[in-house]
Amino acid sequence: MARLYAATGDGIVRLEESDETWTVGLLLSGSGAQCLAVDPADPDTLYAGLRQGGLHRSVDGGRNWVDCKLPELAVFSLAVSAADGAVYAGTEPSRLFRSDDRGESWREIEALLELSSRPSWSFPPRPWTSHVRWIAPNPHDPGLLLVGIELGGLMRSSDGGQSWQDHRPGAQRDVHSLAWHPHVPGRAYEAGGGAAFSTDAGESWQRADGGRDRHYTWSVTVDPDDPDCWYVSASTGPFAAHGHGDPQARIYRRRDGEPWQPLGGGLPEPLPALPYALLATDSRMFAGLADGQLWESRDRGDSWAATHVEGERIAALLALAGA
């Protein structure tokens, strides 16, 4: 049985598949979930970050939740390190927290705020503030950590956050999502004001924008079996992407360094809403849209089918148990 979780405006949606039919349940109803993470060592331990409700943890697959008492309420990003089990949470205003006891206690990683670029961090809709949009612990190295500030840059630490390198050369400053390849330690990927990738564990980045006529990218995911095959969602610009016009959204795939190719195969062309969440697993790919639609591909994006799961905005996706 495959299990999928979606962070939505309604709360956490839990989807379980049996005989190619999805059963849907709503958890944390009305919470306005923004982000999700799972403990790689215990798939029943989940973390949910809420827009204005703090951070919550479940140890029974989402049936029951407790407040983890994070010092900030607006949680924009979560991650659990596969290398050492550390839990990270990023907030608005931009603060980064770490827990080494599964969310029972927290300490702030204050060194992030000592970067020289910090005074320039500013989120355009709320220019007086910014937020930690994405946290990406390297799955092989417990000290290696990438953090994306919206809008401020892509920051890197090699010692678990004790010290930081400021915005990395070649990376996009408007960071929306980051990914490591699960099996190739040095390969990393970014979506934001455009797309970029790294082959040296995030030290430096190369832009990858050729072939896309939509340059405002949002979500990024990578083929677990092929570090040279990755995907982004994109729109014509930030205002259209976030509900102020026709987003003209697409999903693109890049293979072997070739230009980006738009994906169709059953998807509306263009999509009526930006895919806020892309997720590639060992056997499938999912796209969660800003209007609540969920699409699925079983052939690495060549063809797609609607899951007939609809609801509020899907902000994040998490797959477990063979999905």
Per-region residue spans from a language model:
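Extracellular glycan-interacting surfaces
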Residues: 1-323
